[in-house]
Amino acid sequence: MASQGTKRSYEQMETGGERQNATEIRASVGRMVGGIGRFYIQMCTELKLSDYEGRLIQNSITIERMVLSAFDERRNKYLEEHPSAGKDPKKTGGPIYRRRDGKWMRELILYDKEEIRRIWRQANNGEDATAGLTHLMIWHSNLNDATYQRTRALVRTGMDPRMCSLMQGSTLPRRSGAAGAAVKGVGTMVMELIRMIKRGINDRNFWRGENGRRTKIAYERMCNILKGKFQTAAQRAMMDQVRESRNPGNAEIEDLIFLARSALILRGSVAHKSCLPACVYGLAVASGYDFEREGYSLVGIDPFRLLQNSQVFSLIRPNENPAHKSQLVWMACHSAAFEDLRVSSFIRGTRVVPRGQLSTRGVQIASNENMETMDSSTLELRSRYWAIRTRSGGNTNQQRASAGQISVQPTFSVQRNLPFERATIMAAFTGNTEGRTSDMRTEIIRMMESARPEDVSFQGRGVFELSDEKATNPIVPSFDMSNEGSYFFGDNAEEYDN
């Protein structure tokens, strides 16, 4: 990143801090996850959960969703102004699973949002601790990225389902702040912008008046976030055009879709963070670990270490494969849904299979599912090695344009080639290079054509033994060059429905 000087690291975004040195960052990230852990322990006490029940990932998700809902100002305000039948705007809750007489039971709980907010603040030294909330949102987003496909959403905005690797963070709420913006993929930003432009086309007042002025500011801010993800001058120049448009319309949508396609080869920089379920932080705090004193990082060895020593359980449906369920959660924990499977498999130490071959549905259990036949098993979340998370797209030759893979956005900073079907991608760029962005389009296509799939990304970067916390001895894996490793290959996952 050329502009590193002006950017805050993503731990700083995560903790809302100003520029800090490495030690301060580690301490404030530690304070953040420690607060999540303390909150979780307190909730388990409130709900009288046994140790086993407190380690159940479904219970963790319910508790996380409750605190996110309790702090969702906008939605709370909306619910109070538009009362709907059977929904108390002041309460929040969800399913809690308990072990009774050798069976799993579902119990629906309801809490005052005010009470949840009080417990959360108490766990976070009396502060609102927005960073911790964002952290939980990103964990949920990473879980969705690994679990669901967004084909429908892509098609609806006129994009190609093959662009799924650009959709990281597509289910993050609007209020996820700078840390949320950092982990959104190029496709996610493009989709948000297209939705906005379409509203403007259908509703003449969208850009007008006092509200319209605010809308326009939001539009420009989103354009700048997307521009910051691109690494080539031509892509950035095109984003300036889109942002400065007086009255955004179909021309801008065309430009954005063109840019999204180009990102399959000229990849954007998208941050990756290992965000773990609240119960994992809770377990560590309960065992006496002091996160703030020890310091913590979302992009180094710490999450791997934490998962090495945590035992988390999950409910398993009758015909699901527990190993596959573990893979799903492992990928979510490391934000690796869009990583090359060759790299993930090497780090994890067991083969990571494409989603089309997984015999498992999502982690959450719907309220109409039969609990009688539910079983539970231990999630295997340990890894053989650890690697540093990246925020670059892995473009080679001086971080300019390089081979993308039609479906990879690297998570780990580990040397590999990025095989891609240039023919498949370039086929999407026939025709339209006229209009005001013609010279930029031509330049982008030229860069894409000169990209070579055999180029090596992250030259010399490797994985590390779990005993090597200072990252002194990189082990550079060698991969079978021909074998491309997309997780979405032969995909049959369910769609994400809100």
Swiss-Prot record:
**Organism expressing this protein natively:** Influenza A virus (strain A/Duck/Hokkaido/8/1980 H3N8)
GO MF terms held by the record:
RNA binding; structural molecule activity
Q: What is its main location?
A: virion
Q: Where is this region: Disordered?
A: 1-21
The UniProt keywords, alphabetically, are: Capsid protein, Helical capsid protein, Host nucleus, Host-virus interaction, Ribonucleoprotein, RNA-binding, Viral nucleoprotein, Viral penetration into host nucleus, Virion, Virus entry into host cell
Q: Which is a Gene Ontology cellular component entry for this protein?
A: host cell
Q: Organism classification, top ranks?
A: Viruses, Riboviria, Orthornavirae, Negarnaviricota, Polyploviricotina
What Pfam families would the database entry show?
Flu_NP (PF00506)
UniProt protein name? Nucleoprotein
**What binding partners and quaternary form does the record give?**
Homomultimerizes to form the nucleocapsid. May bind host exportin-1/XPO1. Binds to viral genomic RNA. Protein-RNA contacts are mediated by a combination of electrostatic interactions between positively charged residues and the phosphate backbone and planar interactions between aromatic side chains and bases.
Q: How is it modified after translation?
A: Late in virus-infected cells, may be cleaved from a 56-kDa protein to a 53-kDa protein by a cellular caspase. This cleavage might be a marker for the onset of apoptosis in infected cells or have a specific function in virus host interaction.
What subcellular compartments does it reside in? Virion; Host nucleus
